Amino acid sequence: LTAQIVSRIEQLIDAGKLRPGQRLPSIRKLAAHHGISYHTAVTAYEQLVASGRISAQQGRGFFIDSHAQPRQPGMSSVASESENSPLGSFWRLFHGSPELMKLGCGWLPPAWRDTQALARVIRRTANFSKSALVEYGDPLGYLPLRQQLCLHLQRKLSLILEPQQVLTTLGATHALDLLIRLLVAPGDHVLVDDPCNSNLVQLLKLRGAQVIGIPRRIDGPDLAFFAETLAKWPVKAFFINSMLHNPTGSSISASNAFQLLRLAHLHDLTIVEDDVYADFGNGHSNRLAMLDGLERVIYVGSFSKTLSASLRVGYVVGPARLIARLADLKLLTMVAVPGFCERFVSIILGDGTYQRHLVSVQHKLRTHQAMALEAFRQWGWEAFCEPQGGMFVWVRHPQVTNPEAFVQEGVEKGIVLVPGSAFSADGQPSPWFRINVAHFDATGASVLFKR
């Protein structure tokens, strides 16, 4: 109830119906009007004061703060200030009101996560190892977890691994950052999918890399363009989502994968396979790490997407010598992943909770994907492909010629999108939109997408 009252008052401020300096009802009147307790009314006003939307004046009551500025629906002050930055569209996803339909986001809805099971494992973790609460962990990562990851990847990718080939990280973004620091020097030419994960492009540019986008087709990278680029430039590495590609949802074919690896071998190219959405798939796999046997492919995975964004644990798999160098870099930059988080993942992998959770999530994703694809088809939208699982579909409409204006229209209708240009390797305009089917509701989405 508190959140609802706060949200309602913020909406009135943003709509200009409550103006700077205007007096608000007393706490008792607010409680009586909304049928809430005195304590709830007090808490609501306290939150609004803390956020700077209203001010309290001793003996007079509560007033709309004279410095409060109307904001776009669902937007926090941080998001409003940052919306014109290169990553501005993504601020809406992180700071928008819970009432918004966040179709542009890259995570599962909170309701899809078994928070009760997670809470049980958290309690078990705390009881199992008190030292994990206060001590530094191993820079390579918690050994039992790395051993479990070896078994996990043997089942998934048929890879025979030793624990010294696995390094834990603070999620996949941290893994990519470590690899970029180790493999890429300023001025190096680096390849990425186009479109691709926008965080990756920003990390590479921060390093001073020359980023070249390889157009993504339904069956994988454009091999002709890939070959031409390798012949033209001394390329250092190729960062790729082979399966359940972000943002298109496409997966590489066996033929495309074999030809890509052949060209990589010919040009002595290192490939970094970012596979954070692996466990959302339907089982079919042409993963490069599996086909290559980790000769020139470095594999990145994560549990942040599937389990919890707060308990961030990712990992890198590669040759032991490379992993040792990454561990040194990790030690310099952050020492170790929090031991509590590593033990949490270790327990949840070992007791069957993780697999049960995946079965449930995969079923929901299949159902929502089918609903979303059918709805977009009826509304006249074109889908890039029909994904083999995962949470994304990539769509466009011939009548939507101004994507940025369409995104703004979505905000006004309570739907948060990210324009396709945000996923472009070089920021070029794009008519496409990434849709997270896990957040899709046909009735709510129709107010924007039904043309």
Where are these regions (language model features)?
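Short beta-strand "wing" residues that participate in macromolecule-binding interfaces
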Residues: 20, 56, 161, 417-418
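N-terminal small-domain helix-loop-helix segment of the aminotransferase-like
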Residues: 78-171, 350-353, 416
